[in-house]
């Protein structure tokens, strides 16, 4: 009995230490990325500025599990969210994983897998990812994201430039200032409706996991969020977040994500 009591006490102390390391201010500050429409990654803001979407729901579940008040901190792109996690301005975020980001933040498991492709205007005859890569084609992507880094790596002939947000990218397509927009496939159907004659290309130039992230040098915090995401994938919480956001056709990431 004494041994069991000692073990339980030690486990309680370890949990308390993990929570303190993860959320030193006493509240869980979560960086989310907003856009005009929801995706498996982006949230939308209501009239009061409150975020809604997959990552907002998962963040809420994490705060509930840790018994912490929740503070959402919203950014227009994942590059700024990465900066906030790295600097300690926020405690946790969710973002696509690539080698560049792994140098800056620590990733737990992916909750979902996605792929990146292009949305092209009507005047561009390209039907596939490969056909976008032609001299004279103007491609745009969101600054400091895994998607634009992958597009830069794979494009050999087309030109590519960055914008600060999805809204700015759509405006450039409408104004004829760009021919193609690089983004996650699940995000694009809504924006195709906003740009007459536009379409989504076949194929993908990137397949990637979207994962929970914390600052480097916080092993207890990383272990805590890893356990949470693994449990959320097993108990249906991630599935529910996807379904509630309108992504019933998107699969939950397997327990051994390809990006980890």
Which residues does each predicted region cover?
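Short helix-initiation/N-cap motifs at beta->coil->alpha
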Residues: 56, 72-83, 127, 161-175, ...
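Short loop->beta-strand "edge-of-pocket" segments that line small-molecule binding or catalytic clefts
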Residues: 26-34, 52, 130-147, 159
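Extracytoplasmic small-molecule ligand-binding "clamshell" domains
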Residues: 15-96, 235, 244
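Acidic, polar ligand-binding/catalytic clefts
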Residues: 37, 60, 64, 69-133, ...
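Periplasmic-binding protein-like
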Residues: 112-122, 185, 189-230, 248-260
């Amino acid at each position: 009995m004494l041994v069991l009591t000692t073990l339980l006490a030690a486990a309680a102390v370890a949990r308390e230490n993990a929570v303190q390391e993860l959320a030193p201010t006493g509240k869980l500050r979560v960086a989310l990325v907003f856009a005009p429409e929801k995706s498996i990654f982006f949230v939308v803001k209501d009239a009061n500025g409150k975020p809604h979407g997959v990552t907002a729901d998962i963040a809420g579940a994490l705060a509930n599990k840790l018994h912490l008040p929740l503070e959402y901190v919203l950014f227009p792109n994942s590059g700024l969210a990465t900066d906030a996690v790295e600097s300690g301005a926020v405690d946790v975020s969710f973002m696509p994983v690539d080698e560049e980001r792994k140098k800056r933040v620590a990733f737990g498991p992916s909750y979902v897998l996605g792929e990146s492709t292009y949305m092209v205007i009507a005047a561009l005859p390209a039907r596939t990812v490969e056909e976008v890569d032609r001299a004279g084609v103007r491609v745009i992507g969101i600054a400091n994201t895994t998607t634009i880094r992958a597009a830069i790596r794979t494009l050999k002939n087309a030109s590519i430039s960055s914008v600060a947000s999805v809204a700015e990218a759509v405006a450039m397509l409408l104004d004829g200032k760009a021919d193609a927009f690089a983004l996650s496939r699940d995000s694009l159907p809504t924006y195709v409706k906003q740009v007459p004659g536009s379409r989504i290309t076949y194929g993908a130039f990137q397949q990637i996991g979207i994962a929970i992230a914390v600052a480097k040098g916080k092993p207890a915090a990383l272990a805590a969020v890893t356990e949470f995401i693994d449990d959320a994938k097993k108990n249906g919480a991630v599935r529910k977040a996807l379904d509630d956001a309108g992504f019933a056709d998107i699969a939950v990431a397997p327990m051994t994500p390809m990006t980890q």
